[in-house]
Amino acid sequence: MTTAVTGEHHASVQRIQLRISGMSCSACAHRVESTLNKLPGVRAAVNFGTRVATIDTSEAVDAAALCQAVRRAGYQADLCTDDGRSASDPDADHARQLLIRLAIAAVLFVPVADLSVMFGVVPATRFTGWQWVLSALALPVVTWAAWPFHRVAMRNARHHAASMETLISVGITAATIWSLYTVFGNHSPIERSGIWQALLGSDAIYFEVAAGVTVFVLVGRYFEARAKSQAGSALRALAALSAKEVAVLLPDGSEMVIPADELKEQQRFVVRPGQIVAADGLAVDGSAAVDMSAMTGEAKPTRVRPGGQVIGGTTVLDGRLIVEAAAVGADTQFAGMVRLVEQAQAQKADAQRLADRISSVFVPAVLVIAALTAAGWLIAGGQPDRAVSAALAVLVIACPCALGLATPTAMMVASGRGAQLGIFLKGYKSLEATRAVDTVVFDKTGTLTTGRLQVSAVTAAPGWEADQVLALAATVEAASEHSVALAIAAATTRRDAVTDFRAIPGRGVSGTVSGRAVRVGKPSWIGSSSCHPNMRAARRHAESLGETAVFVEVDGEPCGVIAVADAVKDSARDAVAALADRGLRTMLLTGDNPESAAAVATRVGIDEVIADILPEGKVDVIEQLRDRGHVVAMVGDGINDGPALARADLGMAIGRGTDVAIGAADIILVRDHLDVVPLALDLARATMRTVKLNMVWAFGYNIAAIPVAAAGLLNPLVAGAAMAFSSFFVVSNSLRLRKFGRYPLGCGTVGGPQMTAPSSA
């Protein structure tokens, strides 16, 4: 997609968006970005999460030239035909491609492993053309199925870098070359007597090692791609939360429905109850209650009248508004919030995979050891073929197939156990930060509170009963769809019939109940000056807590006050206390008013409160905390929490929350119980410990076998044993996570990690 934008000093700037394919990690995104930024007059930013490169240039740069530059770097690029976001899922496509490669590789691996061992250990079983049969079965696995690793390894070589793919590719290639040399070389098979002599002296056919590494790593990469797809699906669906169509008001007063993306600035459009506001703008006519909670965190609907501002992405609850568009499309606050989420996720993805960090040191070390091994054999007077064989053996044994299982197995077991506890772990990259989390930031509406208004108190004037006041109010409010009315109506089942019902926008409702005129609404409308002192005291108390005070009047006489509030979750206080017991600092960050925020913080035990803050402000607070050296976990549920969840070191979203929050978070709390927040932190930490221990197992056996290979004593039995044992211990160690947590969800008690060592260890 190519658009004209306004740059600095009002200069015309051309913006081009390219969809990049072939990137396997954030390092790839950096390479593409660096390649594009080397072009004159080009400023590029590449988002690995969305696979989109956004290029701003003050020159007439041809998009084809940009695509060609990306291709020279080893990737594919095409011009975006939309706004850069697409319904397609690159991670899902990648997972499908990996599954096809995995299925074919797994089918071929079984006969390759059987025949390699049989022909190597028992030469008498070899038949005419056995070399061709074995090679025909193995080569598709080590070439086509393993091509994703070879492609990245070659790209890394061009950039003088090393990653996990480099290690895998080198190991597979070395094992394949050695095997081809063994099976096609003019070697006469040596007949051996005794089973141990046959096993320990078997010919060096390592096709099963090369194929096994390919299969095991493909398994891990497939599950990793699936997890990425699931993690990104909510963010890709974010655009669905905005309005699709808008009713534009024409000069003659008629309306015309057009696609929302065709709306222009200064055009007027109509919004009715239940509809989503299509753009940021100014209300010019009408009055309506607007649910702003998704954008600002304000629990109570906001009454918008002519001259009031409205925000795109919010929902009109009642009334009708005519709005003049001030910001449309990518310029709206909603679109800006989407960009904040994407940018924050892209920054979080900059952390390299743990395996890549290890490989960046391990690969050069192995190559040096292999070279020293060959040199040592030659200096010692060994034959050149023995020197080359020993060097290749070092490369073969250095590639641990369990490396591909180290992270996926831990994540699979942790995800299964987490599901039992009401916790869903979306990915492992950001979980590395959990070991150092020292600050937990909570949103208020929908996180610490239910997000639904409820009656918190009823105060009756002398001569009236609280139940009587509530019943009269509920009878009238039952005919209204206002959120406060719904809360009052739901507070009791005791109702009579109502007649002459009227709803006065911005004031309240009225009606006749059993021949008595009843009004329910704002104190200013009812006439609070003539109220009994206890009613005025109840109003002051409710408003000091950030609650809404609703007055009830019968036949012109004020008879009671009903306090309505966003109820605090029962599990909130215990969760905050559990975090404090773990030595964690807690904060409340909300767009709601200071009085309401302070009241909720006091009830749940949080000392630090920042209220009346916009979504961008939440991101700023998170960044300030991180700049001071804090490692921050954020717990939220709304659209307005998305950017902060993505920017935090660890984001936790309530499962019933919006797609934005879920898309931005690293951990989803499936059930609406906050007592699993500390347990989620514990599970994330335990998972990362398991992943790291798996890495030790994955590398440990192979590192121990390197001296054996360098000494020229390596054979398929040793290589196969190292592969099998390292994989076995990785899986066994991951299964320990099934013991995590003492209590299942719903018992009301947060259990600490209960992990025991596997019996095999």
From Swiss-Prot:
Pfam families: E1-E2_ATPase (PF00122), HMA (PF00403), Hydrolase (PF00702). Induction: Up-regulated in pulmonary and extrapulmonary TB patients. Optimum pH is 7.5. The modification N-acetylthreonine is found at T2. GO terms for molecular function: ATP binding; ATP hydrolysis activity; copper ion binding; P-type divalent copper transporter activity; P-type monovalent copper transporter activity. It is a multi-pass membrane protein. ATPase activity is stimulated by Cu(+) ions. It is an enzyme of class 7 (translocase). Optimum temperature is 37 degrees Celsius. Active across a broad temperature range. It is found in: Cell membrane. NCBIfam families: ATPase-IB1_Cu, ATPase-IB_hvy, ATPase_P-type. Belongs to the cation transport ATPase (P-type) (TC 3.A.3) family. Type IB subfamily. This is Copper-exporting P-type ATPase. It comes from Mycobacterium tuberculosis (strain ATCC 25618 / H37Rv). The gene is ctpA.
